Regions:
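Non-catalytic connector elements of ABC transporters
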Residues: 1-68
Length: 68
């Protein structure tokens, strides 16, 4: 998969909290944790779960997640 965003942080999901509409995802990147809020639908479509390897994609206005 190719993507134009240059700020990509590979990590592992350490926590995911599913709300009615949104999902709060915590990703361990080295010694740090990146927090992301995405739609619940996106989390379900990606089948995100604790322990999954993901890439946090940081843009100036948002943080997206990509699952390999």
């Amino acid at each position: 998969m190719a993507i134009s965003a240059r700020n990509q942080l590979k990590g592992r999901i350490i926590d995911i909290q599913l709300g009615e509409v949104m999902a709060h995802v915590s990703v361990r990147v080295g010694k740090n944790v990146v927090e992301s809020v995405i739609t619940r639908r996106s989390a379900e479509q990606l089948n995100l779960k604790k322990g999954d390897a993901v890439t946090a994609i940081v843009k100036s206005t948002e943080v997206m997640l990509m699952k390999d």
